[in-house]
């Protein structure tokens, strides 16, 4: 995750809109609304003509979608097998590949170096109980959901498992962190621009554009 962040020149702070980032990398990314009530959150597959495709449920909040996109990106980087389709299903037992993807996603979205710098600025000492206001600041700074943040802190031994449930109750009672202007677009801005340009040049009619 650290090497990939360095390659993308993301620094030690927030990663920004993952859908837009992966789109700039040339990946096919989509956020259609999945059927209501489905536990399916994301799909990674490889198409012979289109290449790697990452699909995330458009019903997820933007920050939840970022975490799913990051997990799918991990499968793209490590498990890019044209004969395997990866389904991210909420509540399903995680395979070794899924656990690795979750760890990558948390590390990619919340870099250890950025955390260390932030804690140093706060003069927070590891081993001290993390309070809700500090967790709220961290989630806002890295632009991640509370569960993503706490999962990352847990892997770095900065919080203990028994600290997480009461923190989540307080944090989630106040609503999701700010999404940094992310929108719930079903297709990427790049594909939208291409479609509009094709329509303007008469390569697509009104029905095809719709």
Regions found by a protein language model. Name each.
Residues 1-210:
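Active-site hotspot residues in diverse enzymes, especially metal/ion-binding acidic/histidine motifs
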């Amino acid at each position: 995750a650290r090497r990939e962040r360095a390659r993308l020149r993301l620094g030690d702070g927030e990663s920004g809109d993952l859908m837009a980032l992966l789109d700039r990398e040339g990946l096919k990314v989509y956020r259609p609304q999945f059927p209501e009530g489905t536990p399916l959150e994301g799909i990674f597959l490889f198409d012979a003509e289109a290449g790697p495709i990452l699909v995330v449920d458009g019903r997820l909040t933007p920050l939840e979608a970022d975490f799913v996109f990051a997990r799918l990106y991990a499968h793209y980087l490590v498990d890019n097998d044209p004969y395997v389709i990866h389904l991210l299903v909420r509540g399903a037992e995680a395979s070794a590949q899924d656990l690795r993807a979750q760890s990558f996603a948390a590390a990619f979205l919340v870099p250890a170096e950025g955390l260390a710098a932030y804690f140093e600025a706060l003069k927070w000492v590891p081993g001290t109980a993390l309070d809700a206001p500090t967790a709220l600041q961290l989630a806002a700074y890295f632009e991640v959901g509370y569960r993503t943040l706490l999962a990352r802190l847990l892997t770095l031994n900065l919080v203990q498992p028994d600290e997480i449930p009461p923190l989540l109750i307080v944090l989630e009672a106040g609503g999701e962190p700010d999404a940094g202007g992310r929108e719930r677009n079903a297709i990427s801005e790049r594909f939208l621009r291409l479609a509009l340009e094709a329509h303007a040049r008469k390569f697509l009619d009104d029905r095809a554009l719709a």
